[in-house]
């Protein structure tokens, strides 16, 4: 994990992702009849418990349970997607989820959330978007838009937008750069994620 998160440029993207993940620590308002908003409330409750515990394992579990993990894993490989051996996919995917959980657990104390609001949802071209507003203890306020994919009768979190920037491209850039720095060897990323 340290090898992936070592440069300041890489940390910027992951910090932005962290702000999005940490958005759901203290609920203030929920549109009760909206299933997408109700889903995000469940995510919020579990993130609150995991965040308070400061446990990478609990945060990893929340990402695994509510994230669109298959999509995220595929997208994060970017131009190297076709080079991942089928036998390496399970290790890579679970390693990616653990990476997100560990990094979030490390960074969570830096972004103390005072409260948040889940505002509403809207159907978009690529999924359902749930809008929220995050209030940090220092008075900073962030608007975060969550992108959900519908899976049967439930949803999965696919992305989050902070300051008009979607977060998954930051993870993709991080992973692609790591692979490129290791001679284009996808197995190097798999190895660091499965440690």
What are these regions (language model features)?
Residues 14-25:
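Bacterial N-terminal signal peptides
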Residues 159-195:
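Low-complexity, intrinsically disordered terminal/linker segments enriched in charged
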Residues 33-107:
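Early exported N-terminus immediately downstream of N-terminal targeting peptides
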Residues 141-169:
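Short beta-strand edge/turn micro-motifs at domain boundaries
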Residues 1-9:
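N-terminal secretory signal peptides that target proteins for export/translocation
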Residues 101-142, 192-195:
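Surface-exposed, charged secondary-structure patches
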Residues 26-32:
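Sec/Tat signal peptide C-region and signal peptidase I cleavage site
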Residues 49, 53, 57, 82-87, ...:
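Surface-exposed, polar/charged faces of alpha-helical domains
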């Amino acid at each position: 994990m340290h090898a992936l998160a070592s440069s300041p440029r890489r940390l910027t993207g992951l910090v932005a992702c962290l702000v999005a993940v940490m958005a759901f620590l203290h609920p203030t308002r929920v549109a009760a009849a909206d299933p997408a908003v109700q889903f995000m409330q469940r995510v919020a409750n579990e993130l609150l418990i995991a965040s308070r515990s400061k446990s990478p394992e609990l945060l990893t579990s929340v990402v695994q349970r509510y994230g669109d993990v298959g999509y995220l894993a595929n997208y994060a490989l970017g131009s190297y997607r076709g080079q991942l051996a089928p036998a390496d996919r399970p290790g890579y995917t679970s390693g990616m989820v653990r990476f997100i959980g560990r990094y979030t657990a490390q960074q969570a104390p830096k972004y103390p959330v005072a409260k948040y609001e889940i505002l509403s949802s809207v159907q978009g071209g690529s999924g359902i978007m749930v809008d929220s507003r995050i209030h940090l203890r220092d008075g900073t306020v962030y608007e975060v838009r969550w992108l959900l994919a519908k899976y049967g009768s439930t949803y999965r979190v696919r992305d989050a937008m902070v300051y008009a920037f979607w977060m998954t491209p930051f993870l993709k850039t991080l992973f692609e750069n790591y692979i490129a720095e290791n001679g284009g060897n996808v197995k190097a990323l798999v190895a660091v994620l499965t440690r």
